[in-house]
Amino acid sequence: MNDELAEAVEAEYTSLSALRIRMWAHREHSEFPDDVEVNVRAESDLLARHDVLDVGFGTGDFLKNLHAAGHSGRLVGVDTSESAVADLRGHPGVDARLGSATDLPLPDDAFDRVCARYMLYHVSDPSAALREFRRVSRDGGVTVVVVNHADVVPGVMGMVREEVERHVADPGVRAVNSVHSDNLPDLMGAVFRRVRVRRVDNSLVFHEPAQLLRFAGAVTSMCGMRPDAPERDAVIRSLTTRISSWFERNGGPWRDPKGYSICVGDR
């Protein structure tokens, strides 16, 4: 199962296109204004002099934005995606490395702040990853982990799962494990001296069918369909029909609850 999860995550992030679409949706279609990066910086008491590690950095925007804002401490990112590392490598002021969260290619006691945003639910052994985060943080350091609520955007996820199960003869392992807002505090409490939690609730709101379809197509791998699956076109056609019919009947908007937690662990 662990190998299957790792393979599903690797396939998902061979390209960053689906990730960028999901980020677009949360940035442009959240019901209430919200900036996760701002919240992470605030909850971690991040200072410009801090040495920062971002694990599972994805597009690298968090580190790029810190550098652009004049951050003076070291900025290091580790990701399992070769595409992500290649995209960030060479960016001024940022050290991008290929590596696993459960075996970080970094020395002990190296960072003031360790950040892991929206990635722990992609890891085969979350507890091992948390122990690694603690290992590379300094005395007095802080680790900030962000994960989604347990049943995020249930409307669109349920619809996509139904179509994947209907069209794909042998759905694969979803590219996520079972870590979420409700169980992360206990996982971190077993590793860190003290854990603080901030929950953020919101919704995704789509006013047009094309907006919802774009997002739905970007979460298919989270529902067991590989990005290169031959059934992908059939799934997208069915989703197009269902989404168009829903808007014809209801007029919109499509509103789906979502949320996340920021858990801060003190070393």
Where is each model-derived feature located?
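A short glycine-rich, Lys/Arg-flanked "PGG" loop and its adjoining helix->strand segment in the class I
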Residues: 127-139
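Conserved class I S-adenosyl-L-methionine
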Residues: 1-47, 61-65, 144-166
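Short glycine-centered segments of the SAM/dcSAM-binding site in methyltransferase folds
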Residues: 51, 141-142
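Class I SAM-dependent methyltransferase SAM/SAH-binding core
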Residues: 53, 59-103
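Conserved Class I S-adenosyl-L-methionine
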Residues: 33, 178, 183-267
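A short SAM/SAH-binding and catalytic strip from SAM-dependent methyltransferases
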Residues: 113-125
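A short acidic, Gly/Pro-enriched loop at the edge of an enzyme's catalytic core
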Residues: 102-113
